[in-house]
Amino acid sequence: MKLSKRILACAITAAMATSMLSACNGSTTTSGSASNADTSQGNSSTTENSNSGNNSSTDGNGGSNGGNIVEAPSNGDTLKWLGYYDLNTDDKEIVDKFNDAGYKVETISTSSTEYFTKLAQLVASSDSPDMVRYEWQSYPHGVANNLYTSLDDYVDFDSDTWSGMKDMIENFNYGGKHYYLPYRVNPGVVLIYNQTALDDEGIKTDPLELYKEGKWTWTAWKDIMTEWCNIGDDYYGVMPTGFVAMPFIVSTGTTLIDVDGPNKQIINNMKDANVQRCQEFLSDIANQGMVNAEYTDPSTCLSATKTLFAEFGLDWGWTSAQAAAKDQDIRFVPIPRDDKADKYYTNTDTFGYLVPAGAKNIKAALKYMEICRLNEIDPELIAKSKAEMTAEHLYYPKCPECGVSTADKTIEKCPSCGAARRENKKHSAMSEDLYQIYSDLKDTTSDKFAFLFDDCFGFSTDLTNMLQQGDSEGKGCVLGGPFKFGESYTNLRDSYYGTVESFLEPYRALMQKN
């Protein structure tokens, strides 16, 4: 049996876990459907949206609370944005449309590490920004600490603009109110793998084909890893990352921690039978020597080690791995279905914005959010995004010869002067099969998946660190111990259930007050 190098693995995990969650939580600032921020921002086009005049849900003409929508407060044409990047440059196409609507963005800069501290200071000093981005700790942590403004009075969630996101918006219900307006669904955590390596080793089982045939289950996943690991002692089945067991627990139809906003409850499911069963399954895989507990970047994890699968957020993980191995067939599949689940449950993530408490220009913030959402559902922009994501080659908009920019990134030569355009070497083309999975993992209206969001990383940093890494001595790693090191989940559960409860109790008290 192979022994995991635990000390090194724990050190690397401690260094990487926070950045891993941050990278997944906001992989791209632009409201795009593309998987690579450097290549295609599908919904960031300057294409005019034909519905922008008809679907408005923030102009005071609708009603999600009995039709009593009121006009949002405004103090002019300037949107004060607090962030660790500048929307004017990083979300330029959206800002251009925002400018066309008569608004402008003023950036209040902060670092990602000081983000919540700065926000709290500004709110407390009555100098609130008008809009901030969503982070995993925005809900329930930020909402519980009164950092945001409820948007129920100003937005019609049943409008054409927002109805497609209504269920997702409801996921973030807090005491009957809605503070977070996600405008897009992001594909969650997937398993990336190297099909070329499988072919080279003569393994005939194809995870992608198993998924397409409806046979991609925990059992099928374990079987192919067993076959792979039997090749040699230095072969591993899977490399966990900062998400560790979370997406696998979700596949059972249960989340580790559930915030039931309408009923003002925070539920700790550590003792749930599904959580127990999943953790025991992952612990068994680790104890059979299938788990590579040493974190490696997605650009090298499949090519530099003999690891078959790696657990990453789709946007960053697959694009990085494929871009670094152009001569190999890097693919991805969803987290396998739990054999005993009644549906194919999958983890998901969203992106959008919130309005801080005390904001003076809520109207401008809602206009920005509306533009983002309209871009997200524009059929022309969706088609454009697909064309770019599946294109063999992509090119930078600005011609290196004449300087003219061309919106179509798939054209090899500049339409104005005929010169060759500069190719984007970071681009990796998705096959039609992979693009279909990518689309399915964003489509909450489809019956292919049942989407669940685990609230476990939305509380304090200390709780997140404990779930991922354990305490200061590395003990109590609830999500990582069984999966990475084969630890007994029963022992972890019995020893640390009370500790997790102590982290949750203050949030329960705050929820009852709000």
Where are the regions that the model predicts?
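Short, solvent-exposed loop/beta-turn-alpha elements that line the ligand-binding surface or hinge
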Residues: 152-164, 210-214, 254-277, 337-344
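Glycine-centered hinge/linker elements that transmit conformational signals in sensory
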Residues: 223-225, 260-295
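Conserved N-terminal structural module of periplasmic/extracytoplasmic solute-binding proteins
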Residues: 4, 9-11, 22-140, 376-388, ...
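Hinge/lid segment of periplasmic solute-binding proteins
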Residues: 63-70, 134-188, 219, 333
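Cys/His-rich microdomains that often coordinate metals
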Residues: 404-406, 421
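Short cysteine-rich clusters marking metal-coordination/redox-active sites
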Residues: 399-402, 414-417
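Extracytoplasmic/periplasmic solute-binding protein
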Residues: 132, 174-185, 189-191, 214-266
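Extracytoplasmic/periplasmic substrate-recognition and gating elements
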Residues: 323-395
